């Protein structure tokens, strides 16, 4: 394998496809590699040291024979725990995803904002410090939950999910006297549950996905690349059952090759 000019998108499973959709719209002519560490899904239940070591191992393995333009950590948990160290460890650009509090404060009308994420993400000092910039003017209601990630993964795989279970998880945000009118999804998996979440809230709620900010200098390099995207590859750390559902899903996202990543 000797591949050139790739954007690598890395997540613990399939939730990062929501980030791929964002980036693909902006840079449609790039070649993409999607790396899925499904052997260790979900990362929200792992400790920080494990996530960092695992991220270094996977990125090192996948970039050995690939000319990498950019690595995107398509996972809030990887971003808050490992981004700074990974940027110092590797010599190519690495960016992550963060909850978009700036957008939330601009569109909220009652100044009550919900933030939904995994336990590691919500309780991490990076997020806590970020939130402190917005209080007391804005009331930020935090909800940390790992089960919702698994529910989202089931939906992505076209499996049946229970709206009742989602409602039970969201119950702390549904109290009438201080219900948020804006909800930030602090996990890329949650983008796939938008419709269910909207139906659960009794009032109209604005839902905001995690934000990917690509620095201007990298955007310029990517914009120059005119290569047609026809060589996208998806890597899984654990051999998947090659069901029609997974094949259809990846084909829909233009990933024609599925390979196992031996790590």
Swiss-Prot record:
Substrate binds at residues 11-12, 43-44, 76-77, 188-189. The keyword Cell wall biogenesis/degradation applies. It catalyses: L-glutamate = D-glutamate. InterPro entries: Asp/Glu_race (IPR001920), Asp/Glu_racemase_AS_2 (IPR033134), Glu_race (IPR004391). It is an enzyme of class 5 (isomerase). Keywords: Cell shape, Cell wall biogenesis/degradation, Isomerase, Peptidoglycan synthesis. The active site is at residues 75, 187. The keyword Nucleotide-binding does not apply. Pathway: Cell wall biogenesis; peptidoglycan biosynthesis. GO terms for biological process: cell wall organization; peptidoglycan biosynthetic process; regulation of cell shape. Its EC number is 5.1.1.3. It comes from the Bacteria. One of its GO terms (molecular function) is glutamate racemase activity. Provides the (R)-glutamate required for cell wall biosynthesis. Belongs to the aspartate/glutamate racemases family. This is Glutamate racemase.
